[in-house]
Amino acid sequence: MVKMPTMVKNKINILEEVENMKINKKVIANLTKCYSIAPLKYKGTNCFLVAAEKIDRCILFDSEGNEIETVWNEPGGVMSMVQVPGANGQFLATHKFYSPNDSKEAKIVIATPTKDGKWSIRTLVNLPHVHRFDLIKRNGKTYLIACTLKSGHEYKDDWSNPGKVYAAELPNDLSNFNEEFQLQLKVIKDGMLKNHGYYKVMEEGVETAVISSEIGVFQFIPPETEDTEWEIKQLINTPSSDAVLIDIDSDGEMELAVLAPFHGDTVRIYKKKEGIYKEMYVHPEPVEFTHALYGGNLCGKPSVVIGHRQGKKSLFALTYDAEKRNIQCENIDTGCGPANVYHYIKDNKDIIIATNREIGEVAMYTIES
């Protein structure tokens, strides 16, 4: 089936729906408002974490999708989780970000497995409205980069205080941090209205952060030395919810795939021409409440995997066909409403873990070409 959306000159103007993949779905847990996913290396094995947006569990799974244990039962409000580099299971997580209207008490915590088989949870830093964060390494240093969706909230749907991006060098030893002694953060960019999207992208051997907001998409590059500052590049100025850099057409230069605007219904791919990102493709159908995003290889092909939480609530993959010079779309699931996805390879098979928030299920999709 081929659809012909309205396009302008020099853009890819054909979307082809295909069925090239063999997909097996397995529901591995039921978790109300399941949201965040993160890989975790623990006791020498590859695992992953899934946590809830509201007050509910954080669950540790093995790579087969079997539940290992519960890390916590509350307070929830988990938007992001990231393993501490080199640690045996220790990770950072957001707590108490329940929604844009209920995130004043949000913080970043340290979760550490203890010798008695339990988990210690301590405060790293109180940061109201913190939504996304990550750990980025460069030249032997590890940096925490944290994004607040907004900077204040007085009434429902209050967007009068734009979000900010914070950063700090993360010490190797986190044992001293708690509610009384917290990590000191520095604002590296403010004015980030609806500061929602985050994706780590490796470019020229350097870990970088692609951050999306109402004022556009930015790439944050960590300091090269102790005497230098973060480098910040604006990639586009279009209101955006999430974005990732990926070389989808395999021409050696990364394109920019964008979900727009904030929690919006549009998917665009931009191609860099003469140093400027120009629109290359617009998905012909509205994709209501776009949210989940993965950019990377899927079954050996550069792919953008997208999930949305309203309308058809689908999970689908976009790829580029060089012979036909078109974008191909393959549906993975419908009626699921993913909030986030995580991809890995096991036994030469591609695995996608999705937190299908709208139906309260954690799903494992095993995908083969």
Give the location of each predicted region.
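Beta-propeller-forming repeat regions
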Residues: 17-369
